[in-house]
Amino acid sequence: MKFRPLHDRVVVKRIDAEEKTAGGIIIPDTAKEKPSQGEVIAVGPGGHDDSGKLIPIDIEVGDRVLFGKWSGTEVKIDGQDLLIMKESDVMGVLTDVFSKKKAA
């Protein structure tokens, strides 16, 4: 099944957090917090301003995004746990700065 979000909504798949700390301590499942990073799976066309003009979304499919702990609505689509949230719930897009520096 394919899901197409409406308006300014995005569908995000959480990216699991590390299971070990920097010091090598393994974090049990009960102590883990929900990850606040995810990969964008689908985006809506965007919202509309007061005059009805379409305002496109700045986020693209495949972007790695950072969002708040309580952002979005949890849904299950085709057996996958996903989040549907508004574009305004996304704090920013993560980029791989280190790989760009190595390429230069």
From Swiss-Prot:
Primary location group: cytoplasm
Domain of life: Bacteria
Entry-linked Pfam families: Cpn10
GO biological process: chaperone cofactor-dependent protein refolding
Transmembrane segments: none
Expression induction or repression: By NifA.
InterPro entries (alphabetical): Chaperonin_GroES, Chaperonin_GroES_sf, Chaprnonin_Cpn10_CS, GroES-like_sf
GO cellular component: cytoplasm
Molecular function terms from GO: ATP binding; metal ion binding; protein folding chaperone; protein-folding chaperone binding; unfolded protein binding
Location of this chain's protein in the cell: Cytoplasm
UniProt entry keywords in alphabetical sequence: Chaperone, Cytoplasm
Assembly notes: Heptamer of 7 subunits arranged in a ring. Interacts with the chaperonin GroEL.
Family: Belongs to the GroES chaperonin family.
Record's function text: Together with the chaperonin GroEL, plays an essential role in assisting protein folding. The GroEL-GroES system forms a nano-cage that allows encapsulation of the non-native substrate proteins and provides a physical environment optimized to promote and accelerate protein folding. GroES binds to the apical surface of the GroEL ring, thereby capping the opening of the GroEL channel.
Protein name: Co-chaperonin GroES 3
Lineage: Bacteria, Pseudomonadati, Pseudomonadota, Alphaproteobacteria, Hyphomicrobiales
